Amino acid sequence: MSTNPLVWQQATVRIQQFYRLTKPRVVSLIVFTAVIGMFLSVPGAVPLDKLLLGTIGISLVAGAAAALNCLVEYKFDAIMARTKGRPLPQGKVSVPETLFFLVMVGGLGLFILHQWINPLTMWLTLGTFVGYAIIYTVILKPLTPQNIVIGGASGAMPPVLGWAAITGEISADALLLFLIIFAWTPPHFWALALYRKSDYAKIGMPMLPVTHGEEFTRLHVLLYTIILCIATVLPYLTQMSGLIYLVSVLILDAIFLYYAIRIYLHYTDQIAREAFRYSIIYLALLFTALLVDHYFYF
């Protein structure tokens, strides 16, 4: 009996390591946009069963994709300061264990989506998994500095998945949400790549600051932020959203543009770090504004 507390403690630590493989902070933002997509897809209440099961299914597959990313890049992660503390580089979980875990978790998520949501959502989610974990992580990321731009399509899919989970179809409004995240992805990741340039150079990863230099990357952060600001006004222009969203997004855009201009004109690593952190808050608040406006539209 005296060994029971130790056994439970060891089991808890193991569970925590597998949980860390799913990159919960990253996945939480992904799932949040998917859930908002669910609410925006219908004028009234969202069916509770589809909301819960759709969220669980999408979360599990997103976690599996993150785990596969960790598996593919664990040797690189061991070199980079930002990632060397992850479970695989630390040897806290093995490669076979990670592979088994992601297959089981991802398979369960796809089963839930097919069985209790609809086949369209399951196939779209599987396509998103393949796009992120294989096309982006395995092929594009080590091949081209445009990896973020091309691979951003898979990262922009969650609100479309949420929309399809409730309605069983893809609408033009869902594609607007896709467009917003697609435009958001380059300035978000390039801000990170700027102040982590030495890490990426160390592992030979062709991120834009490594291949084209800081000045070129800073310019593209600004250009893509301008594109993002244009894209985020489209929900209002198409009458998908109203004044609450418009006022909110103009404020959010102004702050993002402020950071992008500072990155371009007066770059420091600290400014890039602040811009990266703000970009996460920005996306969360933008989708929150979409949700509030959806139910209080005027």
Swiss-Prot record:
Name of one Pfam family that matches: UbiA
InterPro entries per record: Protohaem_IX_farnesylTrfase, UbiA_prenyltransferase, UbiA_prenylTrfase_CS, UbiA_sf
Family annotation (CDD domains): PT_UbiA_Cox10
Keyword line: Cell inner membrane, Cell membrane, Heme biosynthesis, Membrane, Transferase, Transmembrane, Transmembrane helix
Keyword Cell membrane: yes
Keyword Transmembrane assigned: yes
Stretches assigned to coiled coil: none
GO cellular component terms attached to this protein's record: plasma membrane
PROSITE patterns: UBIA (PS00943)
TM stretches of this protein: 26-46, 52-72, 93-113, 120-140, 148-168, 174-194, 219-239, 241-261, 278-298
Catalytic activity from the UniProt record: heme b + (2E,6E)-farnesyl diphosphate + H2O = Fe(II)-heme o + diphosphate
Stated family: Belongs to the UbiA prenyltransferase family. Protoheme IX farnesyltransferase subfamily.
Anything else known: Carbon 2 of the heme B porphyrin ring is defined according to the Fischer nomenclature.
Function as written in the Swiss-Prot or TrEMBL entry: Converts heme B (protoheme IX) to heme O by substitution of the vinyl group on carbon 2 of heme B porphyrin ring with a hydroxyethyl farnesyl side group.
Protein name (Swiss-Prot/TrEMBL): Protoheme IX farnesyltransferase
Source taxonomy: Bacteria, Pseudomonadati, Pseudomonadota, Betaproteobacteria, Nitrosomonadales
